[in-house]
């Protein structure tokens, strides 16, 4: 069973851009579980690769989800911090979930389908 989990998690790392040159695909909740899985794999196998993947995933989540989306007119860290300070404190302004659609702007009306469409 452990080998199956290892294979799945290494595939996840590759397909989401964690261990490959693919564009990173980050989604907060899935990535949180992935960090737990990598840490447990490291604990079970003593293979430092899994610890490194967990740390790299945390860093990538902070960098991608702590910043505004690429299609947003705003740039940089959600917190508004400079790049240097944002790297030091990546979660100070919170993290995006990483859903495929942009966040609803404050002036946009509530859409009942928002929850179903984005799995929130």
Locate predicted features.
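Glycan-recognition and catalytic cores of secretory/periplasmic carbohydrate-active enzymes
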Residues: 1-120
